[in-house]
Amino acid sequence: MVNMNIIEIRSDKIYKKIMDAPINKKEDIYRYELMKPFEFKWKCMNVPIVARQKGGYDVIIASEMLGVLSPKDIDEKQKKNINVLSADKIWGTCKETIENSINAFIKEGYDLNIKDYKYSILLANPNSSYTILSDGYWGDGGIPGYIFLSLVPNEYTINRLPVLIAHECNHNIRFQFIEWNNNITLEEMMINEGLAENFATWMFGEEMLGPWVSRTDIETLNTYIKPI
């Protein structure tokens, strides 16, 4: 297979530093050690690592809006979750799944421009509507070369990581051929998500279909989706 470089940003180690840091240091550790490696991704989304003015829109506010746990909430109460993310097996599985997912396209003759793929696993805010809608796990792979996996760590969400990675890798491949546009239409979004979920279930089976496909109903629409 074509050489590729899978770069893991070990969030567990960074989260431990945040957990042990005083409250006035937590945001900078999160900003510069966990999010800075993904600066290009955030730039594509018009999100600055550092706000242009005090209290302004930045990577911390943006990630909180997307359902990621705020650095100010990373304290001793998150110790168990951080310990779950510390298992080397989880990171090894992630790397292997990224390689297998991308190689599936290379074997079909796709000539990919991106050779470096950077990823990390983030702690999701369990009270976020995004997290609730997604059964505690979700991802972001819309910018080629960068993948975020977000979850509330437990047996169910950890077991779902491979299928989530396959879904996000499909986005990573697709957007190497389609220019990213922040003004994406609902039609385009449905196509993107449908292709990604189809690929993920092709790799891991229909029983691994994500909740964003399998359990969307009128009550969910009115209670969670419309308020967002």
Language model: regions and residue ranges:
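Short pre-active-site segment immediately N-terminal to the catalytic Zn-binding motif
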Residues: 149-164
